[in-house]
Design a protein with these regions (language model features):
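Proline-aspartate-enriched helix->loop->beta-strand connector
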Residues: 60-68
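Conserved short-loop catalytic and cofactor-binding motifs
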Residues: 39, 64, 172
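Active-site flanking residues adjacent to catalytic metal/cofactor-binding acidic residues
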Residues: 2-4, 66, 99
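Short, low-complexity, polar/charged sequence segments that are solvent-exposed and flexible
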Residues: 18-21, 40, 82-85, 117-118, ...
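Conserved RNase H-like, two-metal-ion catalytic cores of nucleic-acid enzymes
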Residues: 1-58
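Short alpha-helical basic/polar micro-motif
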Residues: 58-61, 182
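Metal-dependent phosphoesterase core characteristic of DEDDh/y 3'-5' exonuclease domains
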Residues: 30-31, 68-192
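Acidic catalytic cores of enzymes that act on phosphate-bearing nucleotides/polynucleotides
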Residues: 189-207
Length: 207
């Protein structure tokens, strides 16, 4: 699985902050999934290259995402285009190897006039408790990440005094990102009728 964290939803306005990659063998418990989180240290192209190298090295047969085809990968490609950077995405990032769990749900919602379901709502419909990251006294959401946490992290780059603050912010980003990665895998298995227990499901981190 793959997830990204950004400062906005439009690649013309926002930047990549972090990318997460999760690898899981269906024969193993979900708790044995391995995750890699990649954060901005220098440029966005370098961030993408590190994450995509990890994804390609997994040699998986399917990439499972939640809105990866509609948002995550188009955002990545949009940022690379704007930067004039040449980073190849692995074949698994494209259909038919890429299964986006959001697409059918979005289509059904559009047909009925319902709101698009969040990953958290989908998990709860199966009885799973989503992970919760609480930062500065309030739950961290995609909106707060883009408006507050992401920009706060980027402001620490390139400064010696920001290194310690960046380390603490990275811990927050990691829990948020890892929670989304595991949640996507758990939803995939729930859609298949398989009940799984995770490492991050139902956990809460406060900072």
């Amino acid at each position: 699985t793959l997830d990204i964290e950004t400062t906005a939803t439009d690649p013309a306005d926002g930047e990549l902050v972090s990318v997460g990659v999760g690898i899981h063998d269906r024969a193993d418990p979900l708790t044995e999934a391995t995750y890699g989180t990649f954060h901005r240290a220098d440029g966005e192209a370098s961030l993408v290259d590190r994450a995509m190298t990890r994804l390609a090295a997994a040699d998986a047969d399917t990439l499972v995402t939640y809105n990866g085809r509609g948002f995550a990968l188009p955002f990545v490609e949009g940022r690379l285009d704007r930067l004039g950077a040449d980073v190849d995405l692995p074949i698994i990032a494209s259909p038919p190897d890429h299964l986006d769990l959001f697409r059918d749900r979005k289509r059904r919602a559009d047909e009925t006039g319902a709101a698009w379901p969040t990953l958290e709502a989908c998990l709860e419909s199966y009885g799973h408790a989503p992970p919760k990251t609480v930062w500065r006294g309030a739950p961290l959401t995609n909106g707060r990440f883009g408006e507050e946490l992401g920009p706060a992290y980027l402001r620490t780059l390139g400064t010696e005094t920001g290194a310690r603050f960046r380390a603490s912010l990275t811990e927050v980003v990691d829990h948020y990102l890892l929670g989304d990665l595991e949640a996507t895998l758990a939803l995939y298995y729930a859609d298949l009728g398989e009940s799984v227990a995770g490492t991050y499901l139902g956990t809460e981190r406060r900072s």
